[in-house]
Amino acid sequence: MSYSGSYYGGLGYGCGGFGGLGYGYSCGCGSFRRLGYGCGYGGYRYSCCHPSCYGGYWSSGFY
């Protein structure tokens, strides 16, 4: 959660248990894709199925 606050929290969306706007609980395929808000880049419909969908945002250890 500490890393989430730093990286994703800084984006204002969060991902993987943090959720800056309440969307990033665990980046599950179903929940977020149904909402149309990919975690990490909320509002742009990034597939939250895989970490790599965030491009460079998760490059720290998931890309």
Curated annotation (Swiss-Prot):
Q: Which GO terms describe its cellular component?
A: cytosol; intermediate filament
The answer to whether keyword Hydrolase applies is no
UniProt KW keywords: Keratin, Repeat
Q: Name one Pfam family in it.
A: KRTAP
Q: Does the keyword Cytoplasm apply?
A: no
Specify the domain of life of the species encoding this protein: Eukaryota
**InterPro entries for the chain:** KRTAP_type8/19/20/21/22, KRTAP_type_19
Q: What does this protein do?
A: In the hair cortex, hair keratin intermediate filaments are embedded in an interfilamentous matrix, consisting of hair keratin-associated proteins (KRTAP), which are essential for the formation of a rigid and resistant hair shaft through their extensive disulfide bond cross-linking with abundant cysteine residues of hair keratins. The matrix proteins include the high-sulfur and high-glycine-tyrosine keratins.
**Quaternary data:** Interacts with hair keratins.
What family is it from?
A: Belongs to the KRTAP type 19 family.
**PANTHER family recorded:** KERATIN-ASSOCIATED PROTEIN 19-3-RELATED, KERATIN-ASSOCIATED PROTEIN 19-7
Q: What is this protein called?
A: Keratin-associated protein 19-7
Q: Which organism is it from?
A: Homo sapiens (Human)
Top-level taxonomy: Eukaryota, Metazoa, Chordata, Craniata, Vertebrata
Q: Gene that codes for this?
A: KRTAP19-7
